[in-house]
């Protein structure tokens, strides 16, 4: 149990309500959940000792799927060769599936303790325990055994319970006793599922009530518990279960059913309750620009942020009061695509324009002055970024080049390098937060890494993982992870390989020879939520990232504590700027989020 991350009980209080069916569908739905960055590793522990149904629900039996021992304990029966869903049930230990279990309480308790302590699950994201009906000794033994086995590795032995009922009053009456049991045992109830809420006609797909309706919802309202959803009786789902064989791939078969689509909503509600409700609240909306807003940028040290626009102006605001501090305009002749604050303790702002010029603006005394104009690009400047100590400024352009400028002691700027490895428009540049490592992304779908090798700035790594334009790049605050986003709506996470052994064992996307300095690999792909290009990404902290783009949606992702490569969608904010696209996101230091869109507005959000 030391490698099991979440433990969930499925309870009913009454037999015959389809608890094992809900357990099965919850496990299958979690495995294929779209809110995670990979399929989840899930275990099902069937502790309904006198009526073990889980083997049959997965098309397994004791004749062909016997439990065997390893040095670590009992090895589960897996649904397929991926070993992503494991099963443990007394049904696998009986000589015949027709054998009855006629045991007294002490023997049942001993079997439950052995199931909890002796099964070698390996690394599991979720362990779902299918419990027997009622609130008797078996339930107490489950809770006590989990507490005993997990007390040294988990703060809470059970993450929560899902309670299953049917609509009838006789079922909800018994479920109320189960609710009281959870209260006395200090088990959090994640929600109520109403099973058998209707009957789906196999011919016309209409759903008809065959019992009373709304019992589960009424129960949830009475006890102020989350209502996860209703599950109708679908003959096609029953037919699928009946036709399963030990060789059937239930994961694939279930994903094709209508029930899987219905149950995915229940699973999403379940996850919302497990992680806690999260949302983005609008703090304020800031207007003033007369064209689309291209970028937002927060000063890393001072209470200032800047916005830039198609209207050729930059507006600077106090991030505490949201009052307008200054407007920079009149210098640039075309849209201002990007602004970036120099990371020093005075207000110096770089401004990049489609007029191919980058201006450096600084507050001197009580006024803002343009102290330098950097020229050299042949076309629109698309992005600018300062190095971690503010010594270097990188600029990139539609002319396919990346320029690196050095700020001298007298605040002049010298061009150190013109990098021309990209074969198309360069969309974005960003620097590592603690090293002089520059990364660029392009319309040619590639990501390039650059370092000063002592004589010049050299290309040290080139990644070809994207199959469309790379619009956004951002390092995590600790610098260990690089996030990238593209025109297909993908958000990838990349990590640096630290040893020669790692280099030898991965399929590298670096097209340069391995002897060069940098070797990065794709760690994971975040859940594909966006329906269109992702133009902007921003880190709140090392475990929280947000993205936005052409679909007008802001998505917040969070990393699981037990697996750095496993991320889930924490929240989706649809229509964050109405019907308009979102071009820029940036977190302020206190975790407020700035967003800028084609509506010309900057919105300030709080993530709760």
Curated annotation (Swiss-Prot):
Record's keyword terms, sorted: 4Fe-4S, ATP-binding, Cytoplasm, Iron, Iron-sulfur, Metal-binding, Nucleotide-binding, Nucleus, Repeat, WD repeat
Requisite cofactors: [4Fe-4S] cluster
UniProt-listed InterPro entries: CIAO1/Cia1 (IPR028608), Mrp-like_CS (IPR000808), Mrp/NBP35_ATP-bd (IPR019591), NUBP2/Cfd1_eukaryotes (IPR028600), P-loop_NTPase (IPR027417), WD40/YVTN_repeat-like_dom_sf (IPR015943), WD40_repeat_dom_sf (IPR036322), WD40_rpt (IPR001680)
Any one Gene Ontology BP term: iron-sulfur cluster assembly
GO cellular component labels: cytosol; cytosolic [4Fe-4S] assembly scaffold complex; cytosolic [4Fe-4S] assembly targeting complex; nucleus
UniProt cross-references to Gene3D superfamilies, sorted A to Z: P-loop containing nucleotide triphosphate hydrolases, YVTN repeat-like/Quinoprotein amine dehydrogenase
SMART domains: WD40 (SM00320)
Binding site for ATP: 13-20
Family: In the N-terminal section; belongs to the Mrp/NBP35 ATP-binding proteins family. NUBP2/CFD1 subfamily.
UniProt xrefs under PANTHER family: CYTOSOLIC FE-S CLUSTER ASSEMBLY FACTOR NUBP2, NUCLEOTIDE-BINDING PROTEIN NBP35 YEAST -RELATED
Protein name: Probable cytosolic Fe-S cluster assembly factor SPAC806.02c
Organism placement in taxonomy: Eukaryota, Fungi, Dikarya, Ascomycota, Taphrinomycotina
């Amino acid at each position: 149990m030391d490698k099991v991350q979440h433990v969930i009980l499925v309870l009913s209080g009454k037999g015959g309500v389809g608890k094992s069916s809900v357990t099965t569908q919850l496990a299958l739905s979690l495995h294929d959940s779209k809110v995670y960055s990979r399929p989840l590793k899930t275990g099902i522990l069937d502790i309904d000792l006198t009526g073990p149904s889980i083997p049959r629900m997965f098309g397994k039996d004791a004749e062909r799927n016997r439990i065997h021992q390893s040095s670590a304990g009992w090895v589960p029966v897996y649904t397929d060769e991926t070993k992503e869903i494991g099963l443990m049930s007394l049904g696998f230990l009986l000589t015949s599936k027709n054998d009855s279990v006629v045991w007294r309480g002490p023997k049942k308790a001993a079997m439950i303790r052995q199931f909890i302590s002796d099964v070698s699950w390996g690394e599991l994201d979720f362990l779902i325990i299918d419990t027997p009906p009622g609130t008797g000794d078996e339930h107490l033994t489950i809770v006590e055994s989990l507490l005993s086995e997990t007390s040294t590795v988990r703060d809470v032995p059970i993450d929560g319970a899902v309670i299953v009922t049917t609509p009838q009053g006789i079922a909800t009456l018994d479920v109320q006793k189960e609710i009281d049991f959870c209260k006395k045992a200090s088990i959090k109830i994640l929600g109520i599922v109403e099973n058998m809420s209707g009957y789906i006609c196999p011919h016309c797909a209409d759903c008809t009530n065959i019992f009373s309706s709304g019992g589960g919802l009424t129960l949830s309202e009475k006890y102020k518990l989350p209502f996860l959803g209703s599950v109708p009786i679908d003959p096609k789902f029953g037919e699928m279960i009946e036709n399963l064989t030990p060789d059937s791939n239930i994961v694939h078969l279930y994903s094709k059913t209508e029930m899987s689509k219905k149950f995915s909503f229940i699973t999403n509600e379940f996850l919302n309750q497990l992680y806690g409700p999260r949302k983005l609240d609008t703090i304020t909306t800031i207007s003033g620009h007369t064209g689309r807003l291209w970028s937002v940028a927060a000063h890393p040290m001072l209470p200032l942020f800047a916005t830039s626009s198609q209207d050729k102006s930059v507006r600077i605001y106090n991030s505490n009061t949201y009052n307008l501090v200054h407007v920079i305009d009149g210098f640039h002749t075309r849209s201002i695509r990007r602004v970036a604050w120099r990371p020093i303790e005075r207000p110096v702002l770089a401004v990049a324009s489609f007029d191919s010029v980058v201006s450096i603006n600084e507050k001197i005394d009580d006024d803002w002055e343009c102290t330098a104009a950097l020229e050299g690009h042949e076309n629109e400047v698309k992005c600018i970024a300062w190095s971690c100590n503010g010594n270097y400024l990188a600029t990139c352009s539609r002319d396919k080049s990346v320029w690196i400028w050095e700020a001298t002691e007298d605040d002049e700027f010298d061009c150190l390098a013109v990098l021309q490895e990209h074969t198309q428009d360069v969309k974005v540049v960003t620097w590592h937060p603690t090293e002089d490592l520059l990364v660029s992304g392009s319309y040619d779908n590639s990501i390039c890494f650059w370092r000063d090798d002592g004589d010049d700035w050299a290309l040290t790594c080139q990644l070809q993982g994207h199959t469309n334009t790379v619009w956004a790049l951002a390092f995590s605050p600790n610098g260990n992870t690089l996030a990238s986003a593209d025109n297909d709506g993908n958000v990838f996470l990349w990590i640096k390989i630290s040893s020669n052994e790692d280099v030898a064992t991965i399929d590298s996307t670096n097209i340069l020879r391995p002897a060069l300095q940098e070797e990065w690999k794709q760690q994971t792909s975040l859940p594909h939520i966006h329906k269109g290009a992702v133009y902007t990404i921003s880190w709140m902290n090392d475990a929280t990232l947000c993205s936005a783009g052409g679909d007008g949606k802001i998505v917040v992702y969070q990393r699981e504590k037990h697996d750095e490569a496993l991320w889930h969608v924490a929240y989706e904010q649809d229509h964050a700027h109405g019907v308009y696209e979102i071009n820029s996101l940036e977190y302020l230091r206190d975790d407020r989020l700035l967003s800028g869109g084609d509506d010309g507005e900057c919105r300030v959000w709080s993530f709760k």
